[in-house]
């Protein structure tokens, strides 16, 4: 099974809950039960007021002429690993429908791809401006 851990919990808490449940069920049914954890990645969520999130929001607003909707991406990825390991804000961004990511229906049009490049350019400009402003 693939368990998605909410950001207000951690892997150790989930492991303890699993161990307790497995033990209770095994005792109740009079059987031995085993499980193994093959991999784990702590949950991560960047602060919505971080300069990186702000820069992306501004870049998208400038390119799309509308305010983006921030969504919580559950699961594992570079964002979880880098954000937790380095204690830095990290976002996942890309063109296309995020609900179709890694499915048979995943696709990106040329128009979306080019718009994504424009958004990244504008985001980097805003990130530099926000960084320079903070350094003053």
Give residue ranges: language-model regions:
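Metal-dependent amide/peptide-bond hydrolase catalytic core
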Residues: 2-136
């Amino acid at each position: 099974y693939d368990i998605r851990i909410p950001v207000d919990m951690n892997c150790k808490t989930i492991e303890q809950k699993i161990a307790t449940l497995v033990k209770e069920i095994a005792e109740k049914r009079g059987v031995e039960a085993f499980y193994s954890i093959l991999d784990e990645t702590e949950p991560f969520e960047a602060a919505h007021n971080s300069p990186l999130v702000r820069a992306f929001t501004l870049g998208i607003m400038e390119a799309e002429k509308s305010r983006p909707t921030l969504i919580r991406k559950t699961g594992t990825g570079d964002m979880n690993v880098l954000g937790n390991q380095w204690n830095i804000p990290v976002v996942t961004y890309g063109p296309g429908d995020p609900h179709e990511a890694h499915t048979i229906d995943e696709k990106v049009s040329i128009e979306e791809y080019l718009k994504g490049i424009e958004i990244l350019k504008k985001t980097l400009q805003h990130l530099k401006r926000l960084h320079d402003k903070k350094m003053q």
